[in-house]
């Protein structure tokens, strides 16, 4: 990224940043923000020797957009992982790889929400394309409520080629498509898996779709014909979690 820093906004996101290894340059809090989670921010900052600058809330409104909850931190720019980092994350846990592939996802709130769920289910990383897709931004960080500090995100030039390379390394590529015949509940979540989620409006691109080993669908029993990308991703991720972590074992 060209810029040297980003902003983290919101109490949860800043707390997770303070707990992580990310370099934090400055920390601002709105005057009289001392209750609840704000107190945890203050204690963590004190423990790390970080000085808090107390400013009028209007000052924070001018600095960033979005609901900052009276807490803003300036941090080192978000760094993208390498693909090998994702494999390493699976290897360190002695687990079969489980990756999320996001094909031209544009909504930062969707990306942040997917990151949050991916961390919750123990996925080993997310892959996004460099072009025509949202990257790691302040809005994404806020929507992830701190998951951005824990889930590695790799950014690649050619998503279809990356999927081909994954297949060569033994990963099964499963795409989501409304026209697919296979119900998502029949998916084998125990195999080395890359789950592809298409963009909000168009779904998966043709080249990406052609690289999939299987296509699955989410059955729709009501009147609507599609789900929000982050909702669909969440359902699919927890299906993989359910298969890998049977109740009672």
Swiss-Prot record:
Enumerate the CDD domains for this protein.
Answer: SpoU-like_RlmB
Tagged with keyword Methyltransferase: yes
Q: Does the keyword ATP-binding apply?
A: no
Q: From the Swiss-Prot or TrEMBL record, what is one GO molecular function term?
A: RNA binding
Per the record, the domain of life is Bacteria
Against Gene3D superfamilies, the record matches this protein to:
3.30.1330.30, 3.40.1280.10
Q: Which UniProt keywords apply?
A: Methyltransferase, Transferase
Residues that bind S-adenosyl-L-methionine, according to the entry?
198, 218, 227
Family matches, as InterPro entries: Alpha/beta_knot_MTases, Ribosomal_eL30-like_sf, rRNA_MeTrfase_TrmH, SpoU_MeTrfase, SpoU_subst-bd, tRNA_m1G_MTases_N
Q: What is its EC number?
A: 2.1.1.-
Q: Which family does it belong to?
A: Belongs to the class IV-like SAM-binding methyltransferase superfamily. RNA methyltransferase TrmH family.
Record's protein name: Putative TrmH family tRNA/rRNA methyltransferase YacO
